[in-house]
């Protein structure tokens, strides 16, 4: 951490993937299984680093409780910026091949059809498609409400108290908020919803 700080590093992108341990095991985030996320966030913030945490939803071992658990972690850890995504089975990956062999893909050639990011392209295992979509949408609304962003801002790293830090934090959060809320106002049906 000291070397990162001396290098001028202001923040880190951390792919948490999931707050649920079974999912971390599924995606082979073995190192995460031995790390207390709250302690890691406390140390990073204590050293002045901002954190952009990334979470992905739709893994087989997740259930609908993952959304509330993720929100609790985001707010309690006072994560600076958040990226929330729905799992995407890219062609040529083991995930794509497995979902295809299990008959869980809604559309085989989804990438040729222009589906936007965060479109649910497969039948989830640990929850219904509707539960995943509604939980994901609700989590986005809660995470990017002005109240939640302000609450996280005032408990954050010292770098945000600089003009540059404020601009970075506000820019990332407001642009992400705009992207999510634009998508939620004009929702795209998931691949299995039509024809």
Task: Enumerate the predicted regions with their spans.
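General helical structural elements
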Residues: 89, 165, 181-183
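A conserved cytosolic signaling coiled-coil/coupling helix that links sensory/transmembrane modules
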Residues: 92, 167-169
């Amino acid at each position: 951490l000291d070397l990162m700080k001396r290098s001028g590093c202001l923040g880190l992108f951390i792919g948490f993937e999931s707050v649920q341990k079974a999912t971390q095991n599924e995606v082979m985030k073995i190192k995460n299984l031995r790390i207390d996320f709250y302690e890691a966030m406390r140390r990073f913030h204590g050293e002045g680093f901002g954190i952009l945490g990334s979470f992905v939803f739709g893994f087989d071992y997740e259930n609908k409780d993952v959304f509330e658990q993720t929100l609790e972690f985001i707010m309690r850890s006072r994560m600076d910026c958040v990226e929330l995504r729905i799992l995407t089975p890219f062609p040529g990956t083991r995930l794509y091949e497995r979902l295809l062999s299990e008959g869980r893909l809604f559309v085989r050639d989804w990438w040729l059809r222009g589906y936007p990011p965060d479109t649910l392209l497969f039948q989830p295992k640990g929850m219904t498609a509707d539960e995943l979509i509604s939980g994901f949408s609700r989590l986005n609304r809660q995470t990017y409400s002005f109240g939640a962003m302000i609450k996280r801002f005032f408990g954050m790293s010292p770098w945000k108290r600089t003009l540059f830090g404020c601009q970075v934090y506000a820019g990332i959060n407001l642009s992400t908020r705009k992207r999510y809320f634009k998508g939620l106002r004009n929702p795209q049906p998931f691949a299995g919803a039509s024809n």
